[in-house]
């Protein structure tokens, strides 16, 4: 059965004809959800949870060479004002409750980017008794950025993937 849409009803198909008619007259047809998701992706505020050497690359991403603010992403110091938490580096067992506390202080919808091998799965210190083997055991992670340490370009790509995912799926359901 090729050509059969098994993913469900495509709501854009219904509005495409009406949208074409109204475009000539200067109107735009969209849904409130699409408008909110568009605005949300253009104003992501991230806070750093830098724990090791990956944090240096995270800071490098926010410098003028990469200028992440042109993508609508700006750093914030308080978890109460941020939408995205970037966990960069080795998460120890002692630091895990603090990570969860900061995550709980963030307003909904909140997103987490895990940056680097240590944050993704323990990395070089995976078999150490004091290391959490991935921050996804403490908080739900939306985007994983691989590398040891990942480059600033890799983090920027991860941020753009998060924006794309929010636009495509709306508020990510957990």
Swiss-Prot record:
Keyword Transmembrane: no
Function comment: NDH-1 shuttles electrons from NADH, via FMN and iron-sulfur (Fe-S) centers, to quinones in the respiratory chain. Couples the redox reaction to proton translocation (for every two electrons transferred, four hydrogen ions are translocated across the cytoplasmic membrane), and thus conserves the redox energy in a proton gradient.
Family: Belongs to the complex I 20 kDa subunit family.
PANTHER family linked to this entry: NADH DEHYDROGENASE, NADH DEHYDROGENASE [UBIQUINONE] IRON-SULFUR PROTEIN 7, MITOCHONDRIAL
Catalytic activity: a quinone + NADH + 5 H(+)(in) = a quinol + NAD(+) + 4 H(+)(out)
GO biological process: aerobic respiration; electron transport coupled proton transport
Keywords annotated in UniProt: 4Fe-4S, Cell inner membrane, Cell membrane, Iron, Iron-sulfur, Membrane, Metal-binding, NAD, Quinone, Translocase, Transport, Ubiquinone
A molecular function GO annotation: NADH dehydrogenase (ubiquinone) activity
Needed cofactors: [4Fe-4S] cluster
Source taxonomy: Bacteria, Pseudomonadati, Pseudomonadota, Alphaproteobacteria, Rhodobacterales
GO cellular component, one term: plasma membrane
GN (gene name): nuoB2
Cofactor note: Binds 1 [4Fe-4S] cluster.
Superkingdom in the source lineage: Bacteria
Bilayer topology annotation: Peripheral membrane protein
Assembly and oligomerization: NDH-1 is composed of 14 different subunits. Subunits NuoB, C, D, E, F, and G constitute the peripheral sector of the complex.
PROSITE patterns: COMPLEX1_20K (PS01150)
Subcellular localization: Cell inner membrane
This protein's name: NADH-quinone oxidoreductase subunit B 2
Database matches in SUPFAM superfamilies: HydA/Nqo6-like
């Amino acid at each position: 059965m090729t050509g059969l849409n098994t993913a469900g009803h495509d709501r854009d198909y219904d509005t495409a004809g009406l949208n074409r008619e109204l475009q000539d007259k200067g109107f735009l047809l969209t849904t409130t959800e699409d408008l909110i998701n568009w605005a949300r992706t253009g104003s992501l505020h991230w806070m750093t949870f830098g724990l090791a050497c990956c944090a240096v690359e995270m800071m490098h991403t926010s410098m003028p060479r990469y200028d992440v603010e042109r993508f609508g992403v700006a750093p914030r110091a308080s978890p109460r004002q941020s939408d995205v938490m970037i966990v960069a580096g080795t998460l120890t067992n002692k630091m895990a409750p603090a990570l969860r506390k900061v995550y709980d202080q963030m307003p909904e919808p909140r997103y987490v980017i895990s940056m680097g091998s240590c944050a993704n799965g323990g990395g070089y210190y995976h078999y150490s008794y004091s290391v959490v083997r991935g921050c996804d055991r403490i908080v739900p992670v939306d985007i994983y950025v691989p590398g040891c340490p990942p480059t600033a370009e890799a983090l920027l790509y991860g941020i753009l993937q998060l924006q794309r995912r929010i636009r495509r799926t709306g508020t990510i359901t957990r």
